[in-house]
């Protein structure tokens, strides 16, 4: 369970990071 959650998080993190960078600009 935790393994799939970790892989899902690693996939979502980059997109969330990009969204945060866009809001900063």
UniProtKB/Swiss-Prot annotation:
Domain of life: Eukaryota
UniProt KW keywords: Antibiotic, Antimicrobial, Cytolysis, Hemolysis, Membrane, Secreted, Target cell membrane, Target membrane
Pfam families: Antimicrobial_4
Tissues showing expression: Expressed by the venom gland.
Keyword Secreted carried by entry: yes
Subcellular location: Secreted; Target cell membrane
Any single GO BP term: killing of cells of another organism
A GO term from the CC aspect: membrane
Primary site of residence: secreted
Function, in words: Amphipathic peptide that shows antibacterial activity against E.coli (MIC=12.5 ug/ml) and S.aureus (MIC=12.5 ug/ml). Has hemolytic activity against human erythrocytes (25 uM provokes 83% of hemolysis). May act by disrupting the integrity of the bacterial cell membrane. Increases efficacy of antibiotics (ethambutol, pyrazinamide, isoniazid, rifampicin) when tested against S.aureus, probably by facilitating their incorporation into the bacteria.
Family per record: Belongs to the non-disulfide-bridged peptide (NDBP) superfamily. Medium-length antimicrobial peptide (group 3) family.
Name of protein: Css54
Organism: Centruroides suffusus (Durango bark scorpion)
């Amino acid at each position: 369970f935790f393994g799939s959650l970790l892989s899902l998080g690693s996939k979502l993190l980059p997109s969330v990071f990009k969204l945060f960078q866009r809001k900063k600009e």
